[in-house]
Amino acid sequence: IYGEHFQGRLFYDKKSLKAPALIIVSGSEGRIEKAQNMAQLLSSRGYICLAVAYFGLEGLPKHLERIPLECLVGAKDYLRQHPQVDSERIGIYGRSKGAEFVLAEESLFNDVQCLVLNSPSDVVYEGIKGKWNSHTSSWTHLQKELSYQKFRLRDYLFSKLFRKTFPKDCSARIDVGQIHSPILLLGSTVDEIWDASSAIDDIVSHYKGHYIIFKKYHETGHMLTVAYQPNHRYRKDWRLLMKESKDSWLATIHFFDRH
């Protein structure tokens, strides 16, 4: 599927009629493979699933910088026009930078049934250009960059040395108060990429909708992946890692089934 601002792959049962739909958005690895893996799994449960790529494929931005929020708007419009989709039952799953992307977009266009955010951020961070910071925002709206938290080596080293979070730039905070869709938040208290745990706390405290739940894990870090898949990133007892990944996956399934 080739949209104006996104590319995607759709997974669904051809016999489906007015089925609920999900948009799957992965993180800073780009391309589509990880989103596609999850879309395939969720489609087996009766959802029409659109795995979305927003950079890293031919025809899309090369790097994670200045990605238009209109990417997700276009993905939602595509699903609403699909004859087999129930346009009133569309949810979004985002993980890592994808969760940040989804939260930023939904703070302006809150028009889906529910959100699952895995290892989220509640601020817009600077973009990534290869292995370096891009000196631009990760996201744009109407071709204008969203205010963003700049990457400063001093802040990063301080957070690692003293195990304290560096202060967030207030102008870069995502306006969570504009979101009223039900939300499930998943994250780790030992996230090695960013402080997803405090982001979850801040999202919960600023949320003004009617239903938000969260689950925090203490063994698995940022890569809280699909259950039953090996996770060699962490040198910990595989049974503890699998228990957490299984719990987060079941929470995701049950949340989407409920909403």
Regions of interest found by a model, annotated:
Residues 30-36, 74-143, 162-169, 178, ...:
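Primarily recognizes the serine-hydrolase "nucleophile elbow" in alpha/beta-hydrolase
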Residues 16-19, 24-61, 192-196:
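Short substrate-entry loop that stabilizes the transition state in hydrolases
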Residues 190-194, 222-223:
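Acidic catalytic loop of the alpha/beta-hydrolase fold
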Residues 54-87:
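Catalytic nucleophile-loop/oxyanion-hole region of alpha/beta-hydrolase
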Residues 1-17, 240, 244:
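N-terminal cap/lid segment of alpha/beta-hydrolase-fold proteins
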Residues 179, 185-187, 191:
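Short beta-strand/loop motif that positions the catalytic acidic residue
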Residues 201-204, 208-259:
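C-terminal catalytic histidine-bearing segment of alpha/beta-hydrolase fold enzymes
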Residues 38, 181, 195-206, 229:
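Short alpha-helix in the alpha/beta-hydrolase fold that links the catalytic acid
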